[in-house]
C-alpha cells in the first residue's frame, strides 16, 4: 500500500537533489576561467542527460534487481517487479537516478579546463552504466557490504567517494593545466573568474543537501521517522556550519587572511562528511565530524596541490574523496549504537574501513581501464592550443559565455582576467609553437590586393617596459633604426603584494608597458615578427603583442619624399 506522505517527501527530495546540478555548475564555473565557462555548463548538463537513460537502461537493475553479493541483476528499462515498501517503483527510480547523476558530475570539476568534451561524455556514461551501480548495490542494494553491516546513509561513499576517487584518478591521468606548475615544481595560482557564481553554487548545494540527506529516509510516516528526519537535517546543517568555521580559521592562521574559495570548500566538505552518518550520530558527533572535515579539506588541498602535484581546479578531490572517506570512517567512531567512542569497540570501524577500501579498489580498477581506453582512442585531453585559447571556442564554437562584455587595455590588446601567466617553459627554443603564440600574440591585417599593395607595413609592438631595451637592440641588429615609442597604461598587481588564491601565490598579470611602432618596406615583416618574438618571450602569457597593418602611403614632412623614399633613412 503506497503512502502519499512518503511519496511526496521522496519526490520533493528528488527534485532538490536534481537542483544540485545547478549548484555544481555554478560552483565549478566560478572556480575556473571565463574562457571555459560554456564548456563547464555543457558538462554539467550532459552528465545528467547521458546518465539518466544509462541508469534507466541497466544501472538501476544492476543496483536493485536482486540480492546477490556482488551484483543485483540485469533488468533493462526497469521492467521487473520491485518492492520498495510505501513507494511505487518509479518514485524510487527517479530518486536514485538523481543520486547517480551526482556521482558523475563530481568528476567534472577536478578535470576541468583540459578534458575533451567527447571524452567526458563517454566516461560519464560508463559511471552511470556500471561503476556507480555495482558499488551502489554493495551498499544499498543488499550486496555484501550491506550484509556485513556497512553503514552509509545517504552516500558519503556510494556517491561522493566514488565520484571523488574517479576525480582524483582522472586529474592524475590528465596531468596539470598549462602554467599550473613552474619549472621547479612550485604550484602557481590559477584564480577562478567569478567567486560570486561559486558562492551561489555552494548556497544552492547546501540548500539541496537537506533533500539529499533528509530525503534519504524515503518516508515521513510515524513519529520515529519524523524525529529521525529532523535530526538528520539538524546534523547536516551543524556539520556544514562548523566545517566552514574550521576552514576559515585554518586559512586565517596559515595564510594571514581567510581565503574565500577554500572557506566555501570547507562548507561542502562538512556536508559530504556528515552524509554517511547523519542518521546515527548525535549533534555532538556531527559537530566533531564537521570540524575535522573543514580542517581536512584545507590540508588536503595543499597536499594535492604541492606534494602530489594533482591539479584539481575546484577542490573536488579534497571535498568529495577525502571527506567521503572521513565521513564513512566517522560512522565507526561516532555512531551512538556501536561507534568506538560510544563503547562499541572496533568492529563497526573495521567494517567501514573495509567498505571504503573495497569501493576504492573497484573504482580505481574500472575507471583506469575506462580512462585508458578513451585515451588510446578518441583522446582524453585537448591540444595545447585548445587549452590556451579556451575550450569554449574550440569545443563549442562559443566566442564567450559573456557576450557583450570585453576587457581591453589602452593598446587594444586583450587581457585575460585573473589569468595565471606562467606557461611552464621560459626557453623559446624548447617551447611549443602554441606556447610561443600564447606568450607573444601576433595579429596581422589581411593583405591588400596587388594593385593596392604599397609593400609597406606598420608594425606595432606592445612590450613590457623591462623588455624595451632588449627589443630595441634586437631590432637595431636587423636594420630597424627608426621607431616611435609611446608609454601606455597598464599598471596592476605588483610582485610582493602578497596576494594568494587557495594558498598559492598569484602572478602579476599587468605591468607597465610601452608601444613601439615601426614602418618598414625593405625589411620583411616576418623577420620583424620573429625578431621581436625572440626578444620578448619569457614563457608567460602577455609577454607581448604584435599588430601588423598595411600602409597605403608615407610622406616625410621635412623633405616631401613619399613611400619607399621616405623610409630610406629610418629603417
Where are these regions (language model features)?
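Glycine- and aromatic-enriched membrane alpha-helices
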Residues: 1-447
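Positively charged, small/polar-rich N-terminal and surface patches that mediate targeting and assembly
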Residues: 394-400, 414-571
Amino acid at each position: 500500500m503506497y503512502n502519499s506522505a512518503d511519496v511526496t517527501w521522496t519526490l520533493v527530495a528528488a527534485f532538490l537533489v536534481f537542483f544540485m546540478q545547478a549548484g555544481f555548475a555554478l560552483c565549478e564555473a566560478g572556480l575556473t576561467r571565463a574562457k571555459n565557462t560554456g564548456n563547464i555548463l555543457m558538462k554539467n548538463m550532459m552528465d545528467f542527460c547521458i546518465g539518466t537513460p544509462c541508469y534507466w537502461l541497466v544501472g538501476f537493475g544492476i543496483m536493485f534487481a536482486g540480492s546477490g553479493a556482488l551484483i543485483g541483476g540485469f533488468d533493462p528499462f526497469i521492467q521487473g517487479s520491485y518492492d520498495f515498501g510505501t513507494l511505487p517503483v518509479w518514485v524510487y527510480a527517479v530518486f536514485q537516478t538523481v543520486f547517480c547523476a551526482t556521482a558523475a558530475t563530481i568528476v567534472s570539476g577536478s578535470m576541468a579546463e583540459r578534458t575533451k568534451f567527447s571524452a567526458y561524455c563517454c566516461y560519464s556514461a560508463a559511471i552511470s552504466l556500471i561503476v556507480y551501480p555495482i558499488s551502489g548495490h554493495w551498499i544499498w542494494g543488499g550486496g555484501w557490504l550491506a550484509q556485513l553491516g556497512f553503514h552509509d546513509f545517504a552516500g558519503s561513499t556510494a556517491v561522493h567517494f566514488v565520484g571523488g576517487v574517479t576525480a582524483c584518478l582522472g586529474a592524475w591521468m590528465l596531468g596539470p593545466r598549462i602554467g599550473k606548475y613552474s619549472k621547479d615544481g612550485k604550484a602557481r595560482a590559477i584564480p577562478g573568474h567569478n567567486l560570486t557564481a561559486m558562492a551561489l553554487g555552494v548556497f544552492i548545494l547546501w540548500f539541496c543537501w537537506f533533500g539529499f540527506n533528509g530525503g534519504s529516509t524515503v518516508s515521513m510516516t510515524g513519529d520515529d521517522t519524523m524525529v529521525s528526519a529532523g535530526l538528520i537535517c539538524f546534523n547536516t546543517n551543524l556539520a556544514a556550519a562548523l566545517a566552514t568555521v574550521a576552514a576559515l580559521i585554518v586559512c586565517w592562521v596559515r595564510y594571514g587572511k581567510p581565503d574565500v574559495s577554500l572557506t566555501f570548500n570547507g562548507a561542502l566538505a562538512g556536508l559530504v562528511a556528515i552524509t554517511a552518518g547523519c542518521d546515527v550520530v548525535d549533534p555532538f558527533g556531527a559537530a566533531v565530524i564537521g570540524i575535522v572535515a573543514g580542517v581536512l579539506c584545507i590540508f588536503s588541498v595543499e597536499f594535492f596541490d604541492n606534494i602530489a602535484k594533482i591539479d584539481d581546479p575546484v577542490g573536488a578531490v579534497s571535498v568529495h574523496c577525502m571527506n567521503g572517506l572521513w565521513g564513512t570512517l566517522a560512522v565507526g567512531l561516532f555512531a551512538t549504537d556501536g561507534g568506538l567512542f560510544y563503547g562499541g569497540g572496533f568492529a563497526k570501524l573495521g567494517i567501514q574501513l573495509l567498505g571504503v577500501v573495497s569501493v576504492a579498489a573497484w573504482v580505481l580498477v574500472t575507471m583506469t581501464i575506462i580512462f585508458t581506453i578513451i585515451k588510446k582512442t578518441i583522446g582524453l585531453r585537448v591540444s595545447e592550443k585548445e587549452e590556451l585559447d579556451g575550450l569554449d571556442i574550440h569545443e563549442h564554437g562559443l566566442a564567450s559565455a559573456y557576450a557583450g562584455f570585453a576587457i581591453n587595455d589602452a593598446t587594444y590588446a586583450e587581457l585575460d582576467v585573473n589569468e595565471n601567466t606562467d606557461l611552464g617553459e621560459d626557453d623559446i627554443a624548447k617551447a611549443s609553437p602554441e606556447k610561443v603564440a600564447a606568450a607573444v600574440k601576433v595579429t596581422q591585417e589581411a593583405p591588400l590586393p596587388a594593385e593596392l599593395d604599397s609593400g609597406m607595413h606598420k608594425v606595432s609592438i606592445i612590450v613590457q617596459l623591462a623588455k624595451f631595451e632588449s627589443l630595441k637592440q634586437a631590432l637595431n641588429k636587423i636594420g630597424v633604426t627608426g621607431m616611435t615609442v609611446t608609454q601606455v597604461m597598464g599598471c596592476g598587481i605588483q610582485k610582493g603584494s602578497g596576494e594568494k588564491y587557495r594558498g598559492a601565490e598569484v602572478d602579476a598579470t599587468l605591468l607597465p608597458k610601452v608601444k613601439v611602432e615601426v614602418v618598414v618596406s625593405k625589411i620583411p615583416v616576418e623577420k620583424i615578427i620573429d625578431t621581436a618574438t625572440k626578444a620578448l618571450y619569457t614563457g608567460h602569457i602577455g609577454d607581448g603583442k604584435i599588430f601588423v597593418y598595411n600602409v597605403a602611403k608615407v610622406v616625410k614632412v621635412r623633405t616631401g619624399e613619399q613611400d619607399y623614399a621616405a623610409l630610406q633613412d629610418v629603417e
